């Protein structure tokens, strides 16, 4: 299944369940068991999420799913100031995209970013079980009221508006739909297709 513009396959390992006031209530592993050789291992689940940015050395946050440095403002990379800067960038992105969205899940996510204190990440009881894996770079996403936040129709529309506004792609004949529209300049990498 091809994702629409602004969406792509993203590996995610943990869901952060938040309350209406933004409080982190629970962390759940969403990893799936996969057979690798003769061993069964836990692997991140691949979900269709807002397209991740291509990172180099700069700070660039992803919308709705990212690692702990961006989502929580803490990681185990040994540079706490950078983690705080990553969190600030992530908070700014979510505030910008969701500022006018009235859905309860959008408001809960905005409350999370307003109230989360990165310096207390290591002490938060909801993170205890998976702390090491989370701080090692596993991707995190959000749940509100039992549902993934990225499935909220209002949030999806807000992301698509933002993505279209940020895209200065030339218009042309689209190969997949046959329609006239903006041509994507960057496509997700094709993975796991054997020797190519």
In which residue ranges do the predicted regions lie?
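Conserved phosphate-interacting/catalytic interface
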Residues: 1-172
